[in-house]
UniProtKB/Swiss-Prot annotation:
Biased composition (Polar residues): 45-58
Pfam families linked to this entry: DUF4512
Family that this chain belongs to: Belongs to the UPF0729 family.
Protein name per UniProt: UPF0729 protein C18orf32 homolog
Region (Disordered): 45-81
């Protein structure tokens, strides 16, 4: 048997999202925006290229000056038993 709050709370949330929020949100949103403003994110212009490559998800593997012939460098990182 399912407890009463497990049925009532999702039902009340659905009623709020479906019927009450479209009327209440335009009234409440200007009030909330007055004290909860979003700050603009500023990117520094003097950032290092390596930092920017890592921050945007395109981190390139760093080379130590030696070329690998046909092997993969990932295999060296795996744990061997």
């Amino acid at each position: 048997m399912v407890c009463i709050p497990c049925i009532v709370i999702p039902l009340l949330l659905w009623v709020y999202k479906r019927f009450l929020e479209p009327f209440l949100y335009p009234i409440i949103s200007p009030i909330i925006n007055t004290f909860w403003t979003k700050k603009a994110v500023q990117e520094t212009a003097a950032s290092d290229q390596k930092v920017s490559e890592k921050s945007n998800g395109t981190c390139k593997p760093e080379s130590n000056g030696e070329a690998t012939a046909n092997g993969s460098t990932i295999a060296a990182d795996k744990k061997t038993d």
